[in-house]
Amino acid sequence: AIFTEAKQNGQFRAFWKTFDESVNLMASGEVVIQSMWSPAITAVKSRGIPCVYQPLEEGYRSWGGGIGLSKSLSGMELDAAYEYINWYLSGWVGGFLMRQGYYSAVPETSKDFMSENEWGYWFEGKEATDVITSPTGDVLAQAGEVRDGGSFEERMGAVACWNAVMDENQYM
């Protein structure tokens, strides 16, 4: 009710409901500040539009994800599930996620699937030594630029709130 009233009074341009809405609001210039996911920042930057993921003084809001197995799995299904988890954590997925601004549960394995320049930029918070691109090849940063918020340790060390899927999620 508080946010709805504030929106009606002109405080907010919109409450986005989808990833694409958040990107389009920022890319169009309709908004200049919003809560966005890291890949949404990447999507805006890939259009050649400057966009900064501004670290908050209070700290970051962060999400964690995981893979769980049903206790009813056995035999070939259990083997396939473990094979999938092993592949998922082996580094390729982590490298793909990192090029959007996310991290893998095992970020070190991503290093084998990234260039030294990419690893330095996305994980270590170093200046890019060459162009940084998204997973789809769009230019995100030029040589000399650094990632918003710094290194993995700096970013994860500043998380103030870990979000999780709420109980009501299944009804939304």
Where are these regions (language model features)?
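Solvent-exposed loop/turn segments at secondary-structure junctions
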Residues: S38-T42, E58-R61, G91-W92
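Ligand-binding pocket segment of bilobal, Venus flytrap-like solute-binding proteins
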Residues: A1-Q54
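Mature extracytoplasmic/periplasmic domains
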Residues: S70-Q142
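Short beta-strand->loop
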Residues: I49-R61, S72
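Short amphipathic alpha-helical segments
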Residues: G65-I67
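Soluble non-cytosolic domains of exported or imported proteins
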Residues: K17-D20, S35, G75-D79, G149-M156
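Conserved C-terminal helix/tail region of periplasmic/extracytoplasmic solute-binding proteins
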Residues: T133-M172
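Sec-exported extracytoplasmic/periplasmic mature domains
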Residues: K7-Q11, A27, V31, N86-G94, ...
